[in-house]
């Protein structure tokens, strides 16, 4: 193996090891402008996009001890390495696809040490984020509390009203 390829292989191995997960993509009609825009979007969620040869990527997976089936990935691969939350990176891919006519196709991925198919990665990307889930839970907790406060407020205003009426009757 040439020295350049060995260096690239080591670099990819390091990215696989350092990342929380990765997503394999096929890119169709992906221009330089799209690539720049996509990379900028991913940097906001601590992820990066690399175009790699299939052979080098799967060799790096093998030497890193990660098992994954190459599936139907041919030629060059687009790989998103997620150093933060891999689900957020998957969401960025999904959002980018909506804006750019599905120019990226999910092939496979690895999230939380679990290998996923392209469909599974896409399904994970469609789930609510942790932030959205927290907001929903807070909303579920806050709604009954606000109802209790409203009921207590109406009970107290009823008591005040009753006392006012009693005071008016005694003054008459």
Curated annotation (Swiss-Prot):
The keyword Protease does not apply. It comes from the Bacteria. GO terms for cellular component: large ribosomal subunit. Signal peptide: none annotated. Forms part of the ribosomal stalk, playing a central role in the interaction of the ribosome with GTP-bound translation factors. Pfam families: Ribosomal_L10. The keyword NAD does not apply. This is Large ribosomal subunit protein uL10. One of its GO terms (molecular function) is structural constituent of ribosome. Belongs to the universal ribosomal protein uL10 family.
